Design a protein with these regions (language model features):
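Polytopic transmembrane helical bundles with strong interfacial aromatic enrichment
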Residues: 2-219
């Protein structure tokens, strides 16, 4: 039983899990790209540029989910002083920052043909940029503070403050007049996105989730 918790056995399991996820990732990636680039139709208004959505939207979802996880785990770590939680948040933060940047960049590329500009001080775009700064500050704190307790306290405060930004990003399209359209996918209501576009969107989301899992396990 004790061997199960031994570091060498844990790393052995992680290696096996990485190989397993890796094989699924490449198969699902091929399927997702086929649906996104071949089977999915162009939008009747946006044309082929709508295909950027299949990376942009999942990246935005993951960036929001990652920061939410960091905030919750940081609070738990601050209260209960669980070292593993600190390691988890430090591993998630660069992943979340990467996907936030992907969401912002792909959104800018998509915005040019759709809105006629790469950047606008739209409520959602601005709040996403603010979240990227929160990610960056969180990473820098753990990078340059030698004292774990001090780093945990400051990073927990940053994470909690940053958590306030999450509902602003989510509901900005409903609270203010923005360039972004209201949500097309709703958990509790009726989604307005057609299944021919929803399918590749969800497939790409699962592909990126697997990619996140691979990076996390490797770190």
């Amino acid at each position: 039983m004790l061997n199960f918790f031994h570091n060498s056995y844990i790393f052995f399991l992680i290696e096996k899990l990485i190989n397993f996820i890796n094989s699924i990732f490449f198969v699902l990636l091929l399927i997702a790209l086929s649906f996104a680039l071949v089977f999915s139709p162009p939008d009747y208004l946006q044309g082929e540029s709508v295909r950027i959505m299949y990376v942009h939207v999942p990246a935005a979802w993951i960036s929001l989910a990652s920061f939410s996880c960091i905030s919750i785990l940081s609070i738990l770590n601050f209260i209960f002083k669980i070292k593993n939680l600190k390691l988890i948040t430090k591993s998630i933060a660069p992943i979340g920052l990467m996907f936030t940047c992907i969401a912002i960049v792909t959104g800018s590329i998509w915005g040019q043909p759709t809105w006629g500009t790469f950047w606008a001080w739209d409520a959602r775009i601005t709040s996403m940029a603010i979240m990227a700064l929160f990610y960056l500050v969180f990473i820098v704190i753990h990078k340059f503070f030698d004292e774990d307790d001090k780093a945990n306290k400051i990073s927990s405060i940053v994470a909690v403050i940053g958590l306030i930004n999450i509902p602003i990003i989510k509901y900005s399209v409903e609270w203010w007049s923005t360039l972004h359209q209201p949500a097309s996918i709703k958990i509790t209501g009726t989604s307005t996105i057609h299944s021919s576009m929803l399918t590749p969107l969800l497939l790409m989301f699962f592909v990126l989730i697997l990619y996140c899992a691979l990076i996390f396990l490797m770190k």
